[in-house]
Amino acid sequence: MAGASWRIVSAITIATVDPGSGLLHPARQVVSPNRDERPPGTLPELIVVHSISLPPDEYGGPWIDRLFTNTLPPNAPDVHPFFATVMNLQVSSHLLIRRDGEFVQYVPFHLRAWHAGASSYCGRERCNDFSIGIELEGSDERAYEPAQYRALSQAIHALCRAYPSLSPERVAGHSDIAPGRKTDPGPAFDWPRLRALLRLTHG
């Protein structure tokens, strides 16, 4: 049904995607300017799992929002030298999942976020064109939180219900679509755990 909202329910939260607006409930909405239209006729067919922490291995601050909205302050490198390497980037992701499972959405799912970079999936290049990017607040070597796995599985399920072009089998890591260039979500990410949760939620 066009414009319908699909939902999954758990004891913890409700994840709902409205395919009309491309928005996830209950995500906190933060508008990123780093977006554009997908190529005509292109639907989301892949979900890409990333990890991010700003500064590296530090969690809970405002810096991911600042990066994805191009509002890092000029003195950010004084806060941490790593910021000098990302000051001029224009990047985004559709969704961020914080350590406590909070959803933050930057780009509606029907639009193209700038998350994948040079990439290829099953021989098809330019993954930004046909993928949805989900960032987990974390790093390659540190275990992700149970709340993040629950939230990620719920988001994937809701996305698959809203966009039939997606499926739980078409979920890849950034390292899978950009091998040798990217390593996230890294060895700390428990893919079997995610697959088990997806079997429970997707059936």
What are the functions of these language-model segments?
Residues 134:
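Conserved, mostly hydrophobic/aromatic
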Residues 2-26, 40-41, 125, 130, ...:
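Basic/polar, cationic surfaces and motifs that engage anionic cell-wall
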